[in-house]
Curated annotation (Swiss-Prot):
This is Protein POLYCHOME. Induction: Expressed in an S phase-dependent fashion. It is found in: Nucleus. Disruption phenotype: Premature occurrence of endoreplication during organ development leading to an increased DNA content in hypocotyls and trichomes associated with an increased branching of trichomes (e.g. four to five branches). Reduced accumulation of CYCA2-3 during the S phase leading to a premature exit from the cell cycle, thus triggering the onset of the endocycle. Increased tolerance towards ultraviolet B light (UVB), probably due to the enhanced polyploidization. Considerably larger average cell area in the leaf adaxial epidermis leading to fewer but larger epidermal cells. Residues 236-259 are annotated as: Disordered. GO terms for cellular component: nucleus. Interacts with APC/C activators such as APC5, FZR2, FZR3, CDC20.1 and CDC20.5. It comes from the Eukaryota. InterPro entries: POLYCHOME/GIG1 (IPR034590). GO terms for biological process: cell division; defense response; DNA endoreduplication; endosperm development; megagametogenesis; negative regulation of ubiquitin protein ligase activity; positive regulation of defense response to bacterium; regulation of nuclear division. Expressed mainly in actively dividing cells (e.g. central cylinder of the root tip, young leaves and vascular tissues).
């Protein structure tokens, strides 16, 4: 039985073949209609045959049917290293992205971002920090005005007349309600702004009452009166047209959110 054709050993002069290829030869496959088993796989193509391959440089291969099978290089016009792609191997560096390939004299970057990702410089946030500090300073000033020592006109004095260990105190206890600070928004309703006047009225009423009541009883009576007057003021505020309108708008918003 004859030996298979693909197992027949052929002596090929590889140094001569590669030398011919590096000079100006083109590696050709055997035509589909011819099978030269004893010829050299490297053939020299005439110059007229390579006339139509102007854009393909040396080292190309033409396969069966005259089609180009590979392209080892592209002819470049002009001299110098400008515009050529340089491949640098990241020796001794780990976790390097493919961004080490650069054009020209560009420096390699260690960034994990791709080359097409827009890189912007660090923005100056000092203006934002100053604005935040100014806002905090204003809020601190408002809180300070809200808890600062009130003027004598804003004081509402409640004479407690509570003896301590059988002796009167040198200084009377006073309940202080500071006035509304300018430019500071209070979270409570405007009805509580009349607490100052309410406390004054209760103090005047207590002076005319009997002194037989204990201090605890007087305190409880004062708390009940203040609570009663404040609730009356709140009810009056709720009965105003603006309050009714606000309540209706609130209900409408609640119903619309449930749709």
């Amino acid at each position: 039985m004859p030996e298979a054709r693909d197992r027949i050993e052929r002596q090929v002069d590889y140094p001569a073949a590669f030398l011919n290829r590096r000079s100006h030869g083109i590696l050709l496959d055997e035509p589909a209609t011819q099978h030269n088993l004893f010829g050299s796989p490297v053939q020299r193509v005439p110059s007229e045959a390579t006339g139509g391959l102007g854009s393909i440089g040396q080292g190309s291969m033409t396969g069966r049917g005259g089609l180009v099978r590979g392209n080892f290089g592209i002819r470049r016009t002009g001299g110098g290293r400008r515009g050529q792609i340089q491949f640098r191997s990241p020796q001794g560096r780990e976790n390097m992205s493919l961004g080490v390939t650069r054009r020209g004299r560009a420096r390699a970057s260690n960034s994990v971002l791709p080359s097409w990702y827009p890189r912007t410089p660090l923005r100056d946030i000092s203006a934002v920090v100053r604005a935040i500090e100014r806002r905090r300073a204003r809020m601190g000033e408002g809180v300070g005005r809200d808890i600062e020592t009130p003027t004598p006109q804003q004081l509402g004095v409640l004479d407690s007349l509570v003896p301590l260990s059988g002796a009167h105190l040198e200084h009377d206890y006073s309940m202080v309600t500071p006035g509304p600070s300018i430019g500071f928004k209070r979270p409570w309703p405007p009805s509580t702004a009349k607490v100052h006047q309410i406390l004054l009225d209760i103090t005047r009423e207590n002076t005319g009452e009997e002194d037989a009541l204990t201090p605890e009883k007087k305190l409880l009576n004062s708390i009940d009166k203040v609570e009663k007057v404040v609730m009356e003021e709140i009810q009056k505020m709720k009965s105003t047209p603006s309050a009714k309108r606000a309540e209706r708008e609130k209900r409408v918003r609640t119903l619309m959110s449930m749709r």
